[in-house]
Regions:
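Short, cysteine-centered beta-strand-loop-beta hairpins and adjacent loop/turn segments enriched
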Residues: 56-62, 113-116
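Short beta-strand segments that buttress and anchor functional surface loops
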Residues: 49-56, 77-83
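Beta-strand/loop substructures that line and gate deep hydrophobic ligand-binding cavities in soluble
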Residues: 80-135
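A short, structured loop/turn motif at beta-sheet edges
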Residues: 14-15, 42, 69-74, 93-104
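Hydrophobic ligand-binding cavity/cleft-lining segments
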Residues: 1-46, 139
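Short, surface-exposed coil-to-beta transition loops
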Residues: 3-5, 61-65, 87-91
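Generic structural detector for well-ordered beta-strands
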Residues: 7-11, 38, 54, 67, ...
């Protein structure tokens, strides 16, 4: 299946948007169903970093780990899940719009299912992710445009 792709324009510079997106200690401020996230060991973000996340899925919380596979400030980052039955593979791109005071953030997201995840990805996960991504990007836009950094 094709990845889920969603974009939003934000009235902030690419540098501001990228910095906020990759500050995982703040990701729960805008990401739908994210309880917490942190870079393992508190190290600076780089290719190979592990990001520990806790997501609310239904009535329970699930822990997962993503590995950073691309990190090109202030333009793009990529990650892949390395544990659990449902593993996300994603890429975020931040592009300047107009004179560079505005940005377009595009997120591409796909999933790899293992075990029961092979059934859940096409039946539930992709639909929920599409909805959550749109809500999250609207929250991101509102947060950054109101001065939240």
């Amino acid at each position: 299946m094709a990845p889920i792709v969603h974009s939003v324009e934000i009235s902030r510079s690419p540098e501001d948007v990228f910095a906020y997106l990759t500050d995982f200690s703040r990701s729960s401020e805008w990401q739908e169903n994210l309880v917490s996230a942190s870079v393992e060991g508190g190290d600076p973000l780089r290719v190979g970093s592990h990001v520990k996340m806790t997501r609310r899925i239904g009535r329970s919380e699930r822990k997962m780990t993503n590995e950073v596979i691309e990190h090109n400030p202030p333009r793009s980052f990529g990650f892949r899940g390395i544990d659990g039955p449902i593993r996300a593979i994603g890429k975020g791109t931040v592009e300047p719009v107009g004179d560079g005071a505005r940005s377009r953030f595009t997120m591409e997201l796909d999933f790899e299912g293992r075990g029961i995840g092979k059934l859940l990805v096409p039946l539930v996960v992709r639909r929920q992710a599409r909805s959550d991504m749109a809500k999250s990007q609207e929250r991101l836009k509102a947060r950054l445009e109101s001065g939240g950094t």
